[in-house]
Amino acid sequence: MPNIIKIFSGNAHPQLADEIAAHLGMQVSEADVRKFSDGEIFVEIKKNVRGTDAFIVQPTCTPVNDNLMELVLMVDALRRASARRITAVVPYYGYARQDRKSAPRVPISAKVVAEMFMAVGVRRVLCMDLHAGQIQGFFNIPVDHLYAAPVLLKHIKKEFGEDVVMVSPDAGGVERTRAFAKRLNTGLAIIDKRRDRPNECEAMHVIGDVRGKVAILMDDMADTAGTICNGAKTLLENGAKEVHACCTHPVLSGPAVERITNSDLKSFVVTNTIPLGEEAKNCPKIKQLSVSALLADAIERIHNEDSVSSLFV
C-alpha cells in the first residue's frame, strides 16, 4: 500500500477525529474499539494498514485510564499490522499535572505515560498546550507541541474591543498570558493568591490595572473552575467592567459547570481538545471553539515531511 495518511480514533473524542479527517478530505479509518463484559478493552483494525502513515486521535481525558489503554492497544495493533509510522495525536495529555516528584515516594506519572507510548511503538506525538512544557523531554521521540493560541486570539479579536486587559489567574500562568497580551497589544494583570497569616483564608490581590476594562482570564485548563470563578469575583471587586475567561482544556470535573453558571463570568471560552459533557453543553456561558483545522494542518505537514514550526505560536 502506498504511503498514505490513515486517521484512527478511539472512543475518547470521535467527533474531533471526524473534523480532522474532513479537513484532510478523508474519513476516519474503521477500527473496532470496545469493552468486554469484564471491562477489558478490545481493539481490531478493520482494514489493511501496511506501509501507511497512521495517526490516532485520542485525548486521554476522563475516563483517563480507559482512554489511555485504548490508545496504547491501538498503537500495538497498528504496529503489528505493519503501519509505517504511528503518531499519537493527544490534544489533551492526561497525567500532565503529575510531572515531578511533589512529595516523597510518589511517581512521576507524566513520565510513565511517555514511557508507555514509546514502549508500544509510538514514533511521534502531537499534543496541544501541555500543562508543563518540560513533558516533551520525557520522550525520546519527536514531540510536536502545538498551542491553541491562534484559535483563541482570533475569537478575542473578533468579540472584544480595545479596552481589554489579559489576566493570569496565578503566578504560574504569567508567561502564557503575557504572550497573549503582547499579540493583542493589551495590558497585563496577575492575580496573586497568598495567606498573610497562618490559618487565615487565602487572599487574592490584583497586580495591574483592570479598572473600567474588560478582563479576560487565561489558563491552560479548567478542572473544578474554582480558581477562574474566584478570580472573576476579585477582578470585579477591583473595578473591572466585565470578566470573561478562555482556556484550552475544558476538564470541568466535579462542581465546575455549576460554579461557572453561578459565577461573575460573562462567558467562558474553551476548545474541543476534550469533548463537553451534556451539562457543559447546556451552560449558556460556555462556548467551544474547534482546533481541528490546526491539528489537521500539523498532520498534513508531518506526513509531507514539511516544517511544523510555523504552527508553534
Swiss-Prot record:
Its cofactor is Mg(2+). SUPFAM superfamilies: PRTase-like (SSF53271). It is an enzyme of class 2 (transferase). Its EC number is 2.7.6.1. D-ribose 5-phosphate binds at residues 195, 219, 223-227. Keywords: ATP-binding, Cytoplasm, Kinase, Magnesium, Metal-binding, Nucleotide biosynthesis, Nucleotide-binding, Transferase. Pathway: Metabolic intermediate biosynthesis; 5-phospho-alpha-D-ribose 1-diphosphate biosynthesis; 5-phospho-alpha-D-ribose 1-diphosphate from D-ribose 5-phosphate (route I): step 1/1. It is found in: Cytoplasm. Its main location: cytoplasm. It catalyses: D-ribose 5-phosphate + ATP = 5-phospho-alpha-D-ribose 1-diphosphate + AMP + H(+). The active site is at residue 193. The keyword ATP-binding applies. GO terms for biological process: 5-phosphoribose 1-diphosphate biosynthetic process; purine nucleotide biosynthetic process; ribonucleoside monophosphate biosynthetic process. Mg(2+) 1 binds at residue 131. It holds the Pfam family Pribosyltran_N. One of its GO terms (molecular function) is ATP binding. ATP binds at residues 38-40, 97-98. GO terms for cellular component: cytoplasm; ribose phosphate diphosphokinase complex. The keyword Kinase applies. Involved in the biosynthesis of the central metabolite phospho-alpha-D-ribosyl-1-pyrophosphate (PRPP) via the transfer of pyrophosphoryl group from ATP to 1-hydroxyl of ribose-5-phosphate (Rib-5-P). Belongs to the ribose-phosphate pyrophosphokinase family. Class I subfamily. This is Ribose-phosphate pyrophosphokinase. It comes from Desulfotalea psychrophila (strain LSv54 / DSM 12343). The lineage of its organism: Bacteria, Pseudomonadati, Thermodesulfobacteriota, Desulfobulbia, Desulfobulbales.
